C-alpha cells in the first residue's frame, strides 16, 4: 500500500516538475524566456511613464524621466525636458560672440561654453520665477496644469530655495567676465523678474520676452571686447527682439483660448487673423537689422547667404503655420533653433573669410613658435 502511494506521489512530483520546466504555454522554459513571454513574476504593470520594449532614448525628456524621482520635478521646473527655450536664449549669445571674434578666427570657445552654462542656469531661473508668479493661472490652462509648482510637486518655499541655488551658480558664471559685462548681466535680472507680470497688463508680453531673451546679443560682444559697439550690437539686439516676436507669437497661439478665458494677454490675441501680416513685418525688420549689423562688422558673402537662408526659413514658418492647430504651432516654434544655428554658422564662415589682422597673425605666430619649442 505504501509502495503504491509512494509511486503515485513520485509521479505527481515528476508531472509538476515537467510542467514547470515547460513554462506557462507548454513550451520549454528556456525557449519561453528567450522569446520574451512573460512569466508570472514578470506580469507586473510597468512603472508610470515607461513602456515595456521601448528602445533606449537619449532625448532630453527621456534623460529627465530616467533621473532619480525626487529630482525630476526640479528638472522639469528648469524645463530641461524641453531644451528649445535654452537654445533660443543661447543662440543670440553665440551670434554676438561670433561677430566679436578677430577677423579670420573662430569664435572664443571658452566664451561659448561659459555662455552655454549661463543659458541653462538663467533659463531655469527664469522658468522658476515665471511658474512662481503664474502658479494660479497655470492650474487653469490645459498645457501648463502639470507644471511642478501648479501641480503641487514643489512647494513655494522649495521653489524659492531652488531659485536661490540657480541664481548663485549663474552669478558664479557671470563673475568670470569683465566688470563691464558683470554690470550689464546684473541689469538683465530686472527684465527676468518682471517679464511674467507683463502678460497681465499689456498685449505685448512677447516684446518684453524679446528684450529679455536677447540680452546676450549685447553681453556676448562685451564679454569678448570689454564693451559694446553700438553700431553692431544694437542692430543685432533689435534683430533678436524681432525674432522673438515671431516665434513667441506662434507659441502663444497654442494657449490663446485659455488665455482669453483667464484674462491673460498676448500678441496672439492681439493679432488674431492678422498674425501673418504682423509676423511678415517683423521678419523683414529682422533681416534688415541683421544686414546692417553685418555691414557694420565688415562681414563677407557666407554671412549674407545665411541671412538670406534665415529670411527664407522665417517666410516658410509664417506662411505655412496653422495658428489654429497647437501641434503645428509647436513644430514651427521649435524649428527656430535651426534659424539661430544657420545664422551662427554664417557668422563663423563669414568671419573666417576675412583677412586676419596683423595682431592676429603675430599672436598665431607666437603660439605656433611656443608649440614647436615645447
Swiss-Prot record:
Residues 1-34 form a transit peptide. GO terms for cellular component: extrinsic component of mitochondrial inner membrane; mitochondrial inner membrane; mitochondrion. Its EC number is 2.5.1.39. The lineage of its organism: Eukaryota, Metazoa, Chordata, Craniata, Vertebrata. One of its GO terms (biological process) is ubiquinone biosynthetic process. Belongs to the UbiA prenyltransferase family. Residues 35-83, 130-148, 194-200, 252-277, 354-374 are mitochondrial matrix. Gene3D superfamilies: UbiA prenyltransferase (1.20.120.1780). It is an enzyme of class 2 (transferase). Pathway: Cofactor biosynthesis; ubiquinone biosynthesis. InterPro entries: HB_polyprenyltransferase-like, Prenyltransferase, UbiA_prenyltransferase, UbiA_prenylTrfase_CS, UbiA_sf. Mediates the second step in the final reaction sequence of coenzyme Q (CoQ) biosynthesis. Catalyzes the prenylation of para-hydroxybenzoate (PHB) with an all-trans polyprenyl donor (such as all-trans-nonaprenyl diphosphate). The length of the polyprenyl side chain varies depending on the species, in humans, the side chain is comprised of 10 isoprenyls producing CoQ10 (also known as ubiquinone), whereas rodents predominantly generate CoQ9. However, this specificity is not complete, human tissues have low amounts of CoQ9 and rodent organs contain some CoQ10. Keywords: Isoprene biosynthesis, Membrane, Mitochondrion, Mitochondrion inner membrane, Transferase, Transit peptide, Transmembrane, Transmembrane helix, Ubiquinone biosynthesis. Its cofactor is Mg(2+). It is a multi-pass membrane protein. It catalyses: an all-trans-polyprenyl diphosphate + 4-hydroxybenzoate = a 4-hydroxy-3-(all-trans-polyprenyl)benzoate + diphosphate; all-trans-decaprenyl diphosphate + 4-hydroxybenzoate = 4-hydroxy-3-(all-trans-decaprenyl)benzoate + diphosphate; all-trans-nonaprenyl diphosphate + 4-hydroxybenzoate = 4-hydroxy-3-(all-trans-nonaprenyl)benzoate + diphosphate. The chain crosses the membrane at residues 84-104, 109-129, 149-169, 173-193, 201-221, 231-251, 278-298, 333-353. It is found in: Mitochondrion inner membrane. This is 4-hydroxybenzoate polyprenyltransferase, mitochondrial.
Amino acid at each position: 500500500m505504501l509502495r503504491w502511494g509512494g509511486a503515485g506521489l513520485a509521479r505527481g512530483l515528476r508531472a509538476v516538475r515537467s510542467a514547470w520546466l515547460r513554462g506557462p504555454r507548454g513550451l520549454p522554459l528556456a525557449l519561453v524566456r528567450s522569446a520574451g513571454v512573460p512569466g508570472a513574476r514578470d506580469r507586473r504593470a510597468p512603472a508610470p511613464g515607461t513602456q515595456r520594449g521601448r528602445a533606449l532614448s537619449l532625448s532630453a525628456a527621456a534623460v529627465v524621466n530616467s533621473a532619480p524621482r525626487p529630482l525630476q520635478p526640479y528638472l522639469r521646473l528648469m524645463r530641461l525636458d524641453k531644451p528649445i527655450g535654452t537654445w533660443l536664449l543661447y543662440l543670440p549669445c553665440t551670434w554676438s560672440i561670433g561677430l566679436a571674434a578677430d577677423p579670420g578666427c573662430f569664435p572664443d570657445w571658452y566664451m561659448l561654453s561659459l555662455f552655454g552654462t549661463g543659458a541653462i542656469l538663467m533659463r531655469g531661473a527664469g522658468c522658476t520665477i515665471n511658474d512662481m508668479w503664474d502658479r494660479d493661472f497655470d492650474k487653469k490652462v490645459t498645457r501648463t496644469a502639470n507644471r511642478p509648482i501648479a501641480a503641487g510637486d514643489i512647494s513655494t518655499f522649495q521653489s524659492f530655495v531652488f531659485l536661490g541655488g540657480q541664481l548663485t551658480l549663474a552669478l558664479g558664471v557671470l563673475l568670470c567676465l569683465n566688470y563691464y559685462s558683470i554690470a550689464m548681466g546684473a541689469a538683465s535680472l530686472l527684465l527676468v523678474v518682471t517679464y511674467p507680470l507683463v502678460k497681465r497688463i499689456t498685449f505685448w508680453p512677447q516684446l518684453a520676452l524679446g528684450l529679455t531673451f536677447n540680452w546676450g546679443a549685447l553681453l556676448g560682444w562685451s564679454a569678448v571686447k570689454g564693451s559694446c559697439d553700438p553700431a553692431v550690437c544694437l542692430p543685432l539686439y533689435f534683430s533678436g527682439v524681432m525674432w522673438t516676436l515671431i516665434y513667441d507669437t506662434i507659441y502663444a497661439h497654442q494657449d490663446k483660448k485659455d488665455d482669453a478665458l483667464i484674462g491673460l494677454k498676448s500678441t496672439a490675441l492681439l493679432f488674431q487673423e492678422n498674425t501673418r501680416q504682423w509676423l511678415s513685418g517683423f521678419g523683414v525688420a529682422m533681416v534688415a537689422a541683421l544686414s546692417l549689423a553685418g555691414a557694420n562688422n565688415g562681414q563677407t558673402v557666407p554671412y549674407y547667404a545665411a541671412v538670406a537662408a534665415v529670411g527664407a526659413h522665417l517666410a516658410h514658418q509664417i506662411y505655412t503655420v496653422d495658428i489654429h492647430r497647437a501641434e503645428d504651432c509647436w513644430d514651427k516654434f521649435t524649428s527656430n533653433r535651426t534659424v539661430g544655428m544657420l545664422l551662427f554658422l554664417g557668422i563663423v564662415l563669414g568671419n573666417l573669410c576675412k583677412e586676419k589682422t596683423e595682431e592676429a597673425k603675430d599672436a598665431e605666430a607666437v603660439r605656433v613658435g611656443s608649440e614647436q619649442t615645447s
